[in-house]
């Protein structure tokens, strides 16, 4: 029995890498523009095979909410941290529940991962 468990552990010993997103519970703050609120998230890329991440803001039913960032697809190099400012209209604040980052795969002929990761933070 022990040898079977050891064999399974050896065969299925894969390292899974993901990216990180903080804060876990972001809050909206005054942006300096009337009727616009702002929040900031930080992305940390711990995946050597991924270089781009897409940002999205969603309501409780996972429907997209309009928002503005400098870029919707953000380049983040391996082991690099990037801060992203997200702006939204005050009229959409009540609807917005989640801000998510989604890893984007590059289309190339090289061998690549098929694992896409999405990390979401919930607004307080």
List PLM regions with ranges.
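Positively charged n-region of N-terminal signal peptides that target proteins for export
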Residues: 1-4
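N-terminal signal peptide c-region/cleavage motif recognized by signal peptidases
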Residues: 13-15
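Beta-sheet-dominated interaction scaffolds and their linkers
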Residues: 17-42
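Exposed beta-strand and adjacent loop surfaces of beta-rich binding modules
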Residues: 38, 50-54, 96
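Buried hydrophobic-core signal for structured, non-transmembrane domains
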Residues: 39-44, 86, 99-103
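Short acidic, flexible loop segments centered on an aromatic residue
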Residues: 46-64
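Intrinsically disordered, low-complexity Pro/Gly/Ser/Thr-rich segments with frequent PxxP/GP/PP motifs
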Residues: 64-93
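Terminal connector regions
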Residues: 90-124
């Amino acid at each position: 029995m022990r040898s079977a468990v050891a064999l399974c552990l050896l065969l299925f010993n894969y390292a899974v890498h993901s990216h990180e997103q903080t804060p876990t519970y972001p809050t909206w703050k005054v942006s300096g523009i009337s009727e616009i609120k702002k929040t900031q998230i930080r992305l940390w890329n711990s995946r050597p095979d991924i270089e781009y991440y897409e940002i999205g803001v969603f309501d409780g039913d996972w429907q997209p909410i309009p928002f503005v960032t400098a870029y919707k697809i953000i380049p983040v190099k391996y082991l690099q941290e990037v801060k992203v400012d997200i702006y939204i209209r005050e009229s959409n604040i009540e609807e917005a529940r989640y801000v998510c980052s989604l890893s984007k795969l590059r289309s190339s002929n090289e061998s690549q991962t098929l694992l896409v990761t999405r990390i979401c933070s919930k607004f307080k």
